[in-house]
A protein has these predicted regions:
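Acidic/polar-rich alpha-helix caps and helix-coil junctions
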Residues: 3-263
Length: 263
């Protein structure tokens, strides 16, 4: 069950430490977040502002090999993967169902989301269609953070899409399609400006172990959990959504002229 649902995941340890945040969660989270510090030698000091490095399309078999020391990524980049096709299908089916143009069945989920969840690398509970909701063995999914204008079924399909296709360049267009760019509004969602929590004492202990040649100064007098925040240079640095123009994309001038000249 979602960690945002009351009594959803009793094994969730919170998000103060990375090892706790990814423990007892969807295995795809652990598989997505880089915990091995995979870096090119010449950019070893580059870090993610969010505090999370992704390892999608990073090939661990190239560690220590010439291909892993090059700025050229030789990992194949798929144009479209089967999981995207499956997620497109189940979302379209659910949208048609809300319009009364289709009737969702358990088979729809078994052929798409459940097939993905049953992969050996994922091994997540399958979703069961129960009326207007979905359930897993632990109970009916009822996320308290669900938007009122989104059905429980569609909400979970969108969640699954986000998990399956994270870091694949699809999220922005998904939010536009759903008219949910407000999720990325840093004024309405100030938490988006926050980085990762850092336990100073534990970080220094880890750093001194991994990098014995370079030790940061330890001037702490007591253990304290601190938050590192991205400080914006000015208010205009925040991404704020304007509904009147945020969903509009202009036609390229050359295409516009070509269209009319062809006629």
């Amino acid at each position: 069950l979602p960690i945002t649902q009351t009594g959803g995941n009793a094994l969730y340890k919170g998000d103060k430490l990375l090892k706790d945040e990814i423990a007892n969660r969807d295995p795809r989270l652990y598989a997505t977040i880089d915990t091995a510090e995979l870096r090119l030698p010449s950019v070893a000091s580059v870090y993610a502002a969010s505090g999370y490095f992704a390892n999608r399309f990073a090939n661990p078999t190239l560690i220590g090999k010439s291909g892993g020391k090059s700025f050229t990524n030789i990992t194949d980049a798929p144009v479209m993967k089967l999981n995207e096709v499956m997620m497109n299908y189940i979302e379209a089916a659910a949208e048609l169902a809300t319009l009364g143009k289709y009737t969702l069945t358990q088979t729809d989920f078994d052929r798409t989301i459940n097939a993905l969840r049953q992969r050996a690398s994922t091994n997540m509970p399958t979703l069961q269609l129960v009326g207007d909701a979905l359930r897993v063995p632990a109970g009916v999914i009822n996320d308290s953070q669900r938007d009122a204008d989104v059905s429980p079924i569609l909400w979970e399909i969108r969640r699954e899409r986000r998990v399956e296709l994270v870091y694949e360049g699809l999220r922005f267009n998904d939010l536009r399609r759903w008219k949910k760019l407000n999720y990325a509004d840093m004024v309405k969602n100030p938490k988006l400006n926050m980085g990762a929590y850092v336990n100073k004492r534990e970080y220094i202990k880890w750093y001194n172990t991994v990098h014995p040649a370079a030790k940061p100064e330890n001037t702490l007098t007591k253990e304290k959990m601190s938050k590192i925040q991205l400080v914006l240079l000015n208010a205009k640095g925040e991404y704020e959504v304007n509904d009147s123009v945020g969903y509009i994309r202009p036609i390229v001038k050359q295409d516009f002229m070509r269209t009319y000249s062809d006629k």
